[in-house]
């Protein structure tokens, strides 16, 4: 049985604390495929979609105290470190789940979302997607969004290989919790 926390609508992100990192400075390799200006516009668009579906008015951190952030960057550089600030919209776990539900509920009637229906194969003819086979059923489509997430990564790698597609690994950003007395980090965390 698949792990509940990484499958389904929204995947693992559905149960996250709902923080949107609104920067081009880290978080993957999308800037390998487009320039930073275009990427920044897409990040802004995604933020606007989250706002339209329930995130409007949720706090964005990182715009205030620019002088203090500049000073932290200077101190980090003096220690041969990089302090990379980012704007973060904090939606919260409950609001994040509601937003994902509103998004799904907004799909037009001709869009079908199937859960608990693992895809066996992607159907391709003459270099164009035609559909998928899932659970012995054939589903035809003009466009396909294949987004298997971490849980389906192994299947997707094999499927891409069988279709002759080039794949590349992407780093996963992992947060690390370091517990120290509050006084040590207050100059950073209180900004």
What residue spans do the PLM features occupy?
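Dinucleotide-binding Rossmann-like beta1-alpha1 core, especially the glycine-rich loop
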Residues: 7-61
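Residues forming the flavin
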Residues: 1-27, 67-191
